[in-house]
Amino acid sequence: MLKASLKSIASYIPEKILSNTDLEKMVDTTDEWIARRTGIKERRIANENENTSDLGTKAALKAIERANLKPEDIDAILVATLSPDYFTMPSTACKIASNLGLVNISAFDISAACSGFIYLLEQAKALVESGLKKNVLIIGAEKTSSIMDYSDRSICILFGDGAGAGVVSLDNENYILDVHTASNGNYGDLLMTQRSQKSSLCQTLSMQMKGNEVFKIAVNTLSNDVVEILAKNNILAQEIDLFIPHQANLRIIKAVQEKLNLSDEKCVITVQKYGNTSAASIPMAMNDAYEEGRLKKGNLILLDAFGGGFTWGSALLKFGGENF
């Protein structure tokens, strides 16, 4: 029976590095404090003339090629981002479609913050398994630096820029086993992008977070969510080949890893070099594992993510891409 499969993974990493040492010169913080509290050592920052759609396009082109397809084979583009090119329209997905030379295809954005890539997998799975679409391009892309207040030391130390992409198509062997997504809007004010009204035509956006509250809820929610999706599918944690979580904070990742009793060899961690890239973090981490030879065709992968909204989700899949 044919089912939805993640047939490729790719990423685009901006060249500019913003290290903790650099941040010491910008706000009242230290490299030691940031690393101890978050696990982050550096993050990437896009050029001023690079938009979120540009980052996403570069990752998308690699993902399409790795799926042995051409851009014209894509019949839907889904983008998860909290830092779109434009405040309301056009969507970043439409901009990427234009960059790829594609018209008359479905293209839309999903707003699920750091959980965005899990939501993309769920939607792409539904589209291809229903027969509505054949090859769905999913992209997590973020230029968080465009909405970052670099005078706010509580949050500017956390985030970076980047993009990751993959293609979802049908396969009869290595497919997406299950995806679970959920939300609780009662906690929306703990993590948000705040709009301040300067005039009727001029607005500024900045990200705000109540970190301690978010941390506690994230650890409890993710720990329960991954246990539930494994139990639902009668899979033991030890059967997982790779655990690839959203890269928000090393302490959150380690808490869930400990809950599952997984070895370091089975846990993919990239937060130290990219920071939190929101919806892009899971596909970026997957691509690192793929290019390092850790992620191989047929591997059983567990993904999880938690983000503003609150939103969260997890996914179980057997990777369908060819080995790097």
From Swiss-Prot:
Keywords: Acyltransferase, Cytoplasm, Fatty acid biosynthesis, Fatty acid metabolism, Lipid biosynthesis, Lipid metabolism, Multifunctional enzyme, Transferase. One of its GO terms (biological process) is fatty acid biosynthetic process. The active site is at residues 114, 246, 276. It holds the Pfam family ACP_syn_III. GO terms for cellular component: cytoplasm. One of its GO terms (molecular function) is 3-oxoacyl-[acyl-carrier-protein] synthase activity. SUPFAM superfamilies: Thiolase-like. Transmembrane segments: none annotated. CDD domains: KAS_III. It is found in: Cytoplasm. Its EC number is 2.3.1.180. InterPro entries: ACP_syn_III_C, ACP_syn_III_N, FabH, Thiolase-like. It catalyses: malonyl-[ACP] + acetyl-CoA + H(+) = 3-oxobutanoyl-[ACP] + CO2 + CoA. Belongs to the thiolase-like superfamily. FabH family. Homodimer. This is Beta-ketoacyl-[acyl-carrier-protein] synthase III. The lineage of its organism: Bacteria, Pseudomonadati, Campylobacterota, Epsilonproteobacteria, Campylobacterales.
